[in-house]
Regions:
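Asp-based, Mg2+/Mn2+-dependent phosphohydrolase catalytic module
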Residues: 1-124
Length: 124
């Protein structure tokens, strides 16, 4: 439905190709594997592949330290979404805890609070 509305999508991931292809079984979208986010190269490559300018793009991600920081480096608008947590991913869980404290700090400081939302709210 997204593509029917004229929007373009691309999956920019630090995962390898076999893992990404499992996610894309039902999604018709190009991808960039091993993107090395938050380095900007992958973001620029994504813009080039989609044929859009950074001002025309919005990056959607679930990790502050990779997705959002990388998009900010490139100057791309971005949206932080609530993440799915799997018990087997303890390394990511530790990073998420740190992200949670940073986001709470930003909300307390009222800096960018209008952009952060409440992604840690348990209600869906």
């Amino acid at each position: 439905q997204i593509h029917n509305s004229g929007l373009k999508t691309l999956l920019l991931s630090n995962n390898d190709t076999p893992r990404i292809e499992r996610f894309l079984e039902n999604i018709d979208s190009p991808y960039i594997a091993d993107a090395d986010k938050p380095k900007p190269d992958g973001y620029y490559k994504a813009l080039e592949m989609l044929g859009v300018k950074k001002e025309e793009a919005v990056f959607v991600g679930d990790q502050v330290f990779t997705d959002i920081c990388g998009a900010n480096k490139v100057g791309m608008a971005n949206i932080l979404v609530k993440f799915l947590q799997y018990q087997s991913e303890t390394k990511i869980g530790k990073k998420r805890t740190l992200e949670k404290y940073i986001l709470k700090f930003y909300k307390m400081k009222k800096k960018y609070h209008h952009r952060i939302g409440d992604i840690f709210n348990e209600r869906n």
